[in-house]
């Protein structure tokens, strides 16, 4: 039987103790991080109630198996399926979604490297650069970058997208980007998987659009609220709206029945006046008193104003329809012209 070095046994034991001490256990790939950014990340993780421990993949695997068996957590052992690259164990009190967001927010820009794939579109902005005239101008122009010399400096004529997200950096483009001081890459801890309460989360699950989910929750709340109000289901959130709805319904019934209260009297009188004016319109003018004539005149003026407003709205709609028809005719003409 091969002898196992004491330091390996000790390392596995320490890793196992870390895993036992925190509710959330994550695997991260640290292989892309230089030493200094990695030390900064360690500090940030400590400040946010967590610890990062980098070790050999085989020792991490042994530690996870050990804890899974000791605590009777078979799902935890499945975490070893995600070990790859230069793995490290990150233990924390942050839930998996907050952890993913934390790691994404703390990624840092890095210089261009030939063969590396960019995480997002790379744009060379328009304007003067710090570069002096030289062969780089021709190199830029050969790659479709509109560069020229102005006032003794290389100037970019317009914003130019030189790489789309996911595309590889060529050696020639890497030289240009580095000369311009553009850092198209990112370095950070790459999350491989996270374990919490018997569930393993992968990055694709954790990468959610917060604004979209907040909007969905708001809509769901409003639908539930409206349903609860409509079926008169009282809760601290709906009771006020239910009472208001009941009051308005009761008031409408009372007004319809002519039942006089301090809440209904003005509506009942208003309803009676409208009925009276409707009747007065059918009578000869010489039998009406002056007050009734004034009311009828005021009502007529309001009606005329409403009709004029409706005509304006109809005219605007007709103009819009004419514009749309003209556009359709123009498109039809072009189609006929070009077959």
UniProtKB/Swiss-Prot annotation:
GO terms for biological process: cytoplasmic translation; ribosomal large subunit assembly. InterPro entries: Ribosomal_protein_uL10, Ribosomal_uL10, Ribosomal_uL10-like_insert, Ribosomal_uL10-like_insert_sf, Ribosomal_uL10-like_sf, Ribosomal_uL10_arc. CDD domains: Ribosomal_P0_L10e. The keyword Phosphoprotein does not apply. Residues 308-318 have a biased composition (Basic and acidic residues). The keyword RNA-binding applies. Keywords: Ribonucleoprotein, Ribosomal protein, RNA-binding, rRNA-binding. Pfam families: Ribosomal_L10, RL10P_insert. Residues 319-330 have a biased composition (Acidic residues). Residues 307-339 are annotated as: Disordered. GO terms for cellular component: cytosolic large ribosomal subunit. One of its GO terms (molecular function) is structural constituent of ribosome. Forms part of the ribosomal stalk, playing a central role in the interaction of the ribosome with GTP-bound translation factors. Belongs to the universal ribosomal protein uL10 family. PANTHER family: 60S ACIDIC RIBOSOMAL PROTEIN P0, LARGE RIBOSOMAL SUBUNIT PROTEIN UL10. Part of the 50S ribosomal subunit. Forms part of the ribosomal stalk which helps the ribosome interact with GTP-bound translation factors. Forms a heptameric L10(L12)2(L12)2(L12)2 complex, where L10 forms an elongated spine to which the L12 dimers bind in a sequential fashion. This is Large ribosomal subunit protein uL10. The lineage of its organism: Archaea, Methanobacteriati, Methanobacteriota, Thermococci, Thermococcales.
